[in-house]
Amino acid sequence: MKFVGAHVSAAGGVDQAVIRAHELEATAFALFTKNQRQWRAAPLAEDVIEKFKLACEKYGYTSAQILPHDSYLINLGHPVTEALEKSREAFIDELVRCQQLGLSLLNFHPGSHLLQIDEDQCLARIAESINIALDATEGVTAVIENTAGQGSNLGFKFEHLAAIIERVEDKSRVGVCIDTCHAFAAGYDLRTEEDCEHTFAALGKIVGFQYLRGMHLNDAKSEFNSRVDRHHSLGEGNIGKTVFSYIMRDSRFDNIPLILETVNMDIWAEEIAWLKSQAEIEPSL
């Protein structure tokens, strides 16, 4: 079963994200549970939690179909202790919010060394941050997203993701989300079926498909191996549509949220419908 949707707005309340996903005829969705560009947010009120859970029940969304994203401000590999502590506290709060909403996943960007510590030190800090956060919470899996490698962001190599996972103590509560635009911009080609075979074989070998908890389905305005993160609508960028059809026909991507973060939300419903149609084609495996 393929779960397909988009990162929808939670303006007006988190329950509104559920309604917006339903209106797109999505079978999955992503959301922010708080303002993604602010450190602090009011705690979730009981009535807000209840409305969200009721909306999910009404429209048939389980936690396996929902991939919340944390704040963009959080840097779990921050080289400065005070800033690192602030990020860790905020990340724990994000996990708690997911827990309260009955969600089982939290997607996040791993972190940046800001040119002040080396890659391995930063990866170790990220893993330590995850361990601290998992110890302080329960029931929610920390889902590390690959990055385009823009600036000093880590996570652009599959080896980075594997190194973090290796250091996480509770392997049952860590996973990865692969963003196709980020992978392409980081040098993982996805333009042909053969490219897809090679890239996903590398993912399986280096990270392991048992850790795959979600996908972000985005074409790229950015060039191949440019280390620039610029999303585009499916088929309108430099990747093309092949990889998205490939994913929809491959059982390794079943039962996880497959989320659009493409640039034109006016055509999300069309993109979702097209993705669903690809799942009906003979499987690639």
Curated annotation (Swiss-Prot):
Report the co-factor binding details. Answer: Binds 3 Zn(2+) ions.
Give the EC number(s) under which this enzyme is classified.
3.1.21.2
Looking up InterPro entries in the UniProt record yields:
AP_endonuc_2 (IPR001719), AP_endonuc_F2_Zn_BS (IPR018246), Xyl_isomerase-like_sf (IPR036237), Xyl_isomerase-like_TIM-brl (IPR013022)
EC category name:
hydrolase
Q: Where does Zn(2+) 2 bind?
A: 145, 179, 216, 261
Which residues participate in Zn(2+) 1 binding?
Answer: 69, 109, 145
Amino-acid positions noted as binding Zn(2+) 3 in the UniProt annotation, renumbered to this chain:
182, 229, 231
Q: Which Pfam families match?
A: AP_endonuc_2
Per its record, the protein catalyses: Endonucleolytic cleavage to 5'-phosphooligonucleotide end-products
Give this protein's Gene Ontology molecular function annotations. deoxyribonuclease IV (phage-T4-induced) activity; DNA binding; DNA-(apurinic or apyrimidinic site) endonuclease activity; phosphoric diester hydrolase activity; zinc ion binding
Q: Which UniProt keywords apply?
A: DNA damage, DNA repair, Endonuclease, Hydrolase, Metal-binding, Nuclease, Zinc
Identify the cofactor(s).
Answer: Zn(2+)
Q: Name one GO biological process term.
A: base-excision repair
Q: Which NCBIfam families match?
A: nfo (TIGR00587), PRK01060.1-4 (NF002199)
Q: What PANTHER family has UniProt attached to this entry?
A: APURINIC-APYRIMIDINIC ENDONUCLEASE, ENDONUCLEASE IV ENDODEOXYRIBONUCLEASE IV
Function statement: Endonuclease IV plays a role in DNA repair. It cleaves phosphodiester bonds at apurinic or apyrimidinic (AP) sites, generating a 3'-hydroxyl group and a 5'-terminal sugar phosphate.
User: Belongs to which family?
Assistant: Belongs to the AP endonuclease 2 family.
Q: What is this protein called?
A: Probable endonuclease 4
